[in-house]
Design a protein with these regions (language model features):
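Partner-binding and oligomerization surfaces adjacent to conserved cores of proteins
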Residues: 1-225
């Protein structure tokens, strides 16, 4: 078992709240990611057979991706992916052996150059390799990727949701606080092992985000309609 974290904007979290509370995650097309070189690879046009290249491109199109991180306290990731610390970070407890058969979970490899075509690998093996390889400037993210092949749905069971961390700018009086009210309402009906709720905060000149568990006063003062 391991802990993985997913940074989300408040809107995305709210739109899929029931699924997230059930330990499900959603996939996206890798073409929608913020890296303009996502999925790129190098081949030599006059040496590498075109039909092999086309097969790899076809295999890449069969995959959708969901992105995670091993850390919840990375300041830049909160800034990039949670709308300036106004969103959330979800904490999942995950076991690879419990994933659906058409899914794979791997750490991203970071390299100085783009990956190259390799005739010793199948088209599917190369497609997966290219989708979990990024250039070194992205290494600070420490990303893990869940790849789903030929999915019939856009969400799959991933693991147990063990924590929800609300961003440092998720303050009382902010209109986003309605989501926290909804979360408290939902987890009160979950029974055993509900996720722990945390509030992220930034202290002084500390380089990392910190968090505290909501105390009894915090939880009681949230009015649930």
């Amino acid at each position: 078992m391991m802990k993985l974290y997913k940074y989300l904007s408040d809107g995305t979290f709210r739109d899929h709240l029931p699924s997230h509370l059930n330990g499900e995650v959603y996939f996206s097309s890798w073409r929608e990611f913020n890296d303009p070189m996502e999925g790129f690879f190098v081949y030599i046009a006059n040496r590498d057979p075109r039909h092999h290249i086309d097969a790899i491109v076809g295999e890449k199109s069969a995959y959708r991706v969901s992105c995670f991180c091993r850390s919840w306290n990375k300041f830049l990731l909160w800034s990039y992916y949670t709308n300036k610390h106004r969103g959330v970070c979800l904490e999942f407890e995950v076991s690879k052996k419990n994933l659906p058969a058409n899914c794979s979970l791997d750490p991203v490899n970071y390299d100085r150059t783009l990956p190259q075509f390799d005739s010793s690998l199948s088209a599917d093996e190369q497609a997966k390799k290219f989708l979990i390889t990024k250039m070194r400037p992205w290494k600070q993210e420490g990303e893990w990727r869940l790849l789903g092949r030929n999915l019939q749905q856009y969400s799959v069971p991933f693991g147990r949701l063990t924590g929800i961390i609300f961003g440092a700018n998720y303050a009382d009086g902010d209109p986003h606080d309605a989501t926290r009210q909804q979360v408290v309402h939902e987890i009160r009906s979950m029974g055993r092992h509900p996720p722990v709720l945390y509030q992220a905060y930034i202290e002084g000149n500390a380089p990392e985000v910190r968090r505290r568990v909501f105390n009894r006063y915090d939880q009681n003062r949230i009015q649930v309609n």
